[in-house]
Amino acid sequence: MTQKVNVVGAGLAGSEAAYQLAQRGIKVNLIEMRPVKQTPAHHTDKFAELVCSNSLRGNALTNAVGVLKEEMRHLDSLIITSADKARVPAGGALAVDRHDFAGYITDTLRNHPNITVLNEEVNHIPEGYTIIATGPLTTEHLAQEIVDITGKDQLYFYDAAAPIIEKDSINMDKVYLKSRYDKGEAAYLNCPMTEEEFNRFYDAVLEAEVAPVNEFEKEKYFEGCMPFEVMAERGRKTLLFGPMKPVGLEDPKTGKRPYAVVQLRQDDAAGTLYNIVGFQTHLKWGAQKEVIRLIPGLENVDIVRYGVMHRNTFINSPDVLNEKYELKGHDNLYFAGQMTGVEGYVESAASGLVAGINLAHKILDKGEVIFPRETMIGSMAYYISHAKNEKNFQPMNANFGLLPSLEKRIKDKKERYETQAKRALEYLDNYKQTL
């Protein structure tokens, strides 16, 4: 095999992609700029350095990321194998000794006969087969190259996302379907508030705890995308003239205009997930849950992705990537990791796994690998390439709302998740036999 692949970035996604390629006999140049050039967030020269938490989140199959991890175990994931080896006590979560974890991955890749490690900065996308996995702190020159090849409106430099919730957890008796002024089809679920309910909500927002901002995120990335708690600080009426404006949203049950309205917009093609419109936020997750559950209809809501505002570099994947994490119209260029719109350590590694396997199959002329949507790894790939709201695409983590509904509705959440997990692993194992 003379064909050599360039994998740019040795984070979780790049490390996984390089390993999957190398295990299939493909020669790989794994290019990592550290330690020649450090990022503001990294501190070592190790691959797959965990820059925030040392937890890879839940390990149980009643947890979406737990299902994703189990799927990756079935697919010989370097990242999950390393995490299992470096595991430290953390209850039901998979937490690791971050030094052992990164050390095991680094040693495995540096000693792999099919991998050549190059420590240098990449300012231009290499020629030939390439996977870009440079993460949220992609350097300016490479980011400009990505803009040039994907289009000027297809690369974002910050992540300003409103919370995303499960439709099944909304109290539909308290909300109504309507678009403002009845324009177009009724596309929003509306949560009406009385003045008393709004005041209670407003006071809670002002008292809610805000998350600290990392030093390297303090530049002003959020023009035109203000956190709703900052709007609230500007005065009680600011939200009423902003995201909670009730004009044109009269309640069809009463014919009257509510004092305030929180709008929910469909977020996925299947209609199982909704985002809270205009509620991008810096609040801590616990505070978000408390505040959101004060909204009528959302008292018992399940939040699958909390609102965030932080520096990120990610592409508008539904417009430019397919389910193989391949750039549309470019059969030699793939992307992986957070820059594809997946959110989280495990999700990033999973995208690298899919990109690596697919590029290996392309080189070996073995056909494309599209994992079933019933699997968590397949549903993530489907989401980033088919998100309903592609004009305001925001990163997503693994959650059961991405999976197709079960044929038979199961009301008990734990039982439903267990059934979806069992189905996911059955579909994965059946699909593996075709690879």
Swiss-Prot record:
EC numbers for this chain: 2.1.1.74
Cell compartment(s), UniProt: Cytoplasm
Catalytic activity: uridine(54) in tRNA + (6R)-5,10-methylene-5,6,7,8-tetrahydrofolate + NADH + H(+) = 5-methyluridine(54) in tRNA + (6S)-5,6,7,8-tetrahydrofolate + NAD(+); uridine(54) in tRNA + (6R)-5,10-methylene-5,6,7,8-tetrahydrofolate + NADPH + H(+) = 5-methyluridine(54) in tRNA + (6S)-5,6,7,8-tetrahydrofolate + NADP(+)
The protein's required cofactors: FAD
UniProt keyword annotation of Cell division present: no
Keywords: Cytoplasm, FAD, Flavoprotein, Methyltransferase, NAD, NADP, Transferase, tRNA processing
Entry keyword annotation includes ATP-binding: no
InterPro entries: FAD/NAD-bd_sf (IPR036188), MnmG-rel (IPR002218), MnmG-rel_CS (IPR020595), MnmG_N (IPR040131), TrmFO (IPR004417)
Binding site for FAD: 9-14
GO annotation, biological process: tRNA methylation; tRNA wobble uridine modification
Superkingdom per UniProt: Bacteria
Pfam family, one: GIDA
One of the record's GO molecular function terms: flavin adenine dinucleotide binding
Any one GO CC term of the record: cytosol
Family membership noted in the UniProt record: Belongs to the MnmG family. TrmFO subfamily.
Protein purpose: Catalyzes the folate-dependent formation of 5-methyl-uridine at position 54 (M-5-U54) in all tRNAs.
NCBIfam families given in the database record: gid_trmFO, PRK05335.1
Protein's name in the database: Methylenetetrahydrofolate--tRNA-(uracil-5-)-methyltransferase TrmFO
Organism field: Staphylococcus epidermidis (strain ATCC 35984 / DSM 28319 / BCRC 17069 / CCUG 31568 / BM 3577 / RP62A)
Species lineage: Bacteria, Bacillati, Bacillota, Bacilli, Bacillales
